[in-house]
Amino acid sequence: MGKLIKLITTLTVLVSLLQYCCEFNSGSISCERTQTLCHYTNPRVWNTYFSRNCELYKNKVSPGFDIVARKYDTAVKPVIDDATVKVNKAAIQPAFKVIHSQCKKWNCGKYYQLVRSPMVKTRRFFFAKYNAFVKPNLDKFFTAEFRSHLKERILKYKNIGHYYFTITSRCIKSKYDFTVGNTEEKLMGKFKNKDTHGIHGSVTREPSSEDMVLTVSTMESDEEELTTTSTQTVVETITLDQEEASAVANHAHDDEASTDVEGSTDVNVNEQALLQEDFDMWSETILQKTQDVIQLFEKDVSKYINGKLVEEANHFKAKFQSLDDKSKKFFSKISLAINDIECVEGIDSETGKKIFFDKSGSTEISQYITRELVREYFNETRSTLDELTNAMEKDLSEITDEIEKKVNAIREENVEVFEEWGDIIVNEWSKRMAYVDVINAHMGADDDTTLDEEKAKSSVNWKKFLKGKKQIIESRDKLAHHSADLSRVNAFRQKVQKKILSFTQESGEFLYILRSKANLQFQERERKERERKEREKAAAEEFQRQQELLRQQEEEDEEDVSYTSTSTITTTTTMTL
């Protein structure tokens, strides 16, 4: 609630200040949007509008609004007007006198020279850049005739632009003096005099054909126009007297003459000075070009490596997935064989051959699981996984070699571009220096001292040229040996190798566990087989012992029968005798 009250208070203050400014400057506001803003933020306008369209507002609110408006006009507004007059007399007018006295001393010519000096330096800088980068390419596409014609047109428009720039600066100064004088009269006169808002001087008013009618659409009434405000566009025509016109013409003539003099001395004086200044920028240009080529090389390498690594990452992801699937398949095969080590032997009722079932005895297995068979499974798994991981490492090495070859190709391409640029730059600079030497030889001064100075400058310039040429060669060697950033490639390689090593260790550990489990199963089966054989052997020995006992018993029985028969025969014989 407090924030809402602050917002309402702020809006009220802003609207009040706006309305005061609108009322104070009601005769000098020419902007249609400002008039519209003043109109639609005026409380009196809205009071009239709501009074016409709402009976409740007309009867309940409008009388109170009229009372507040009258109190504002009688009690508040006079106080504000007096305070404004005092502030104007005590602060604004003295400050304006000081500012106006300083502004009267303003000289367009000095400021023109002040602005022209950095513009000349900028022109020289762009001229050097143009000769270094743009001109060699333009010479390939445009003929000498076309360039000569274009140069004439540019020189013509340059003189025209210089003339109009001078005229414009004069007009701006005249406009400034006129505006400042008008404002001074307004501030120094009566504080609020609506008759002093006219435009003084040689000014012609031409009303525009467009008038803006500000209306507020009604809700239920047929009256659409609430307030109509007409605006006019003032067209200012500045008329110069004969003296001012002749002064402008003379100044323009002097500018044209100075332009001709500058044009005639550019080759003889400025070209030599410009050449000496440009040698300092040439070194910076070579360094900048070297940095640009290196940045372009690094950008191309980074772009290629990013795309290549994304592509290869997807390929290796598929390879690791295939490796994982195959390893699971082999591990499942070995685990199933280990579970079938403890099998049950049976006899086929049809063929009479031995058949084997799992330990539950419900599922027939394809073959009897032996140590040799399980060992073969382990060897097959180990060899297959080793082949797959070795193939992945080989692919990784090939990818690294491919990236290095591509990076070297990109480097060679950028080196060739820099060499071509360097050849063009050296050629253009040699032509330019030879041209300056020829011009100095034919247009130089007759004074021997000046001639010696020109020769010394030429010698220094040629030494600087040789230094710049060596700098280009050194920059070329620097670019040729600039190492590319392969940290992401190395990180990718280490990541893949680490993953391969991790898979190899995990698969080896799992195979070791399976091998141990298989050994335990085989040992258990062999123990049971030994026990079974011992039981069978014991049973066989017991059976043999029983057979031996039975045989002995039979022999004893046979002996008893033989004795009885002998006794009977003896008795019979005796009785017969």
From Swiss-Prot:
Coiled coil: 379-416, 513-561
Positions of the UniProt region annotated as Disordered: 525-577
Biased composition (Basic and acidic residues): 525-545
Annotated Low complexity bias: 562-577
Keywords: Coiled coil, Mitochondrion, Ribonucleoprotein, Signal, Sporulation
Subcellular location(s) of the protein: Mitochondrion
GO terms (BP aspect): sporulation resulting in formation of a cellular spore
GO (cellular component) term, any one: ribonucleoprotein complex
Signal sequence coordinates: 1-23
Stretches that traverse the bilayer: none
Location (main, coarse): mitochondrion
Family statement: Belongs to the SHE10 family.
Subunit structure as annotated in this protein's UniProt entry: Component of the mitochondria-localized RNase mitochondrial RNA-processing (RNase MRP) composed of one single RNA encoded by the NME1 gene and at least 31 proteins. Absent in the nucleus-localized RNase MRP (NuMRP).
Function noted in UniProt: Involved in spore wall assembly. May be a component of the mitochondrial RNase MRP (MtMRP), a ribonucleoprotein endoribonuclease involved in the cleaving RNA transcripts to generate primers for DNA replication in mitochondria.
Protein name in the entry: Outer spore wall assembly protein SHE10
Lineage: Eukaryota, Fungi, Dikarya, Ascomycota, Saccharomycotina
Gene symbol of the encoding locus: SHE10
